[in-house]
Amino acid sequence: MGSVFITWGGWNGHEPEKTAGICADMLSAEGHDVTVTNVLDPFADEAFMAQVDLVVPVWTMSEIGQAEEAGLLKAVRSGTGCAGWHGGMADSFRNNVEYQFMVGGQFICHPGGIVDYEVNIASDDPIVAGIDDFQMHSEQYFMHVDPSNEVLATTTFKGQHCGIDWVKGVKMPVAWKKRYGRGKVFYSSLGHVATDFDVPEAKEIMRRGCLWAVRP
């Protein structure tokens, strides 16, 4: 099976160690060889990254060095898959726009903080096939997104929170897949804290998305 590299850190409010552990257990159960660390240095090790089949970054905000960013991006462009969730992948390294290009989106805001909202399945792709629309009680991410992403699920804003009424009716991608060079990239905005993965649909979408992104 594949070699999976999960690295966690950054803002602790997103429970990076716990959520990384959930992902590690999930992928280990699928037979993958999973390595978990809390440093970014291995991204700069070209020989190491060349044998990684899936990288899962769990780093809200924080900063990444030039060599580490270049190593990560080169690996994905060369065929290493990349998958992640919420701010751990799409609110990382805010000064690094090429990283954001690889991800396919960037967190902007979450009006109202923790709110009730619906996730709507938007594709018959195997990552979401057979999953019905479902409810979340968490942060509803408003994002800037790459229009070339293949959108798998969406959510619609009601414009009820924080006086941001002009977003009422906006349909926002929740999960997508894309390519970056030869690498497959999957992202889901679900997963603010570890208990968000107690929602079976949210966890299953993440499981399938990670498995899809692993280099064949």
Ranges and model annotations:
Residues 63-130:
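A glycine-rich, often tryptophan-bearing local segment used as a flexible ligand/cofactor-contacting loop or short
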Residues 81-83, 152, 186:
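Structural detector of well-ordered beta-strand residues that form the stable sheet scaffold
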Residues 27-30, 51, 113-181:
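Catalytic beta-strand/loop cores that center a nucleophilic Ser/Cys/Thr
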Residues 3-6, 15-90:
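Helical hinge/lid and interdomain linker segments adjacent to catalytic or ligand-binding clefts
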Residues 99-106, 134-150, 191, 201-216:
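Oxidoreductase and adenylate-handling cofactor-binding alpha/beta cores
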Residues 18, 22, 71, 126, ...:
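Extracytoplasmic/secreted proteins, especially bacterial periplasmic and envelope-associated proteins
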Residues 8-11, 191:
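Residue-level signal for short, function-critical loop segments
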Residues 2-3, 29-30, 166-172, 179-216:
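Extracellular ligand-binding/catalytic regions of CAZymes and related secreted enzymes
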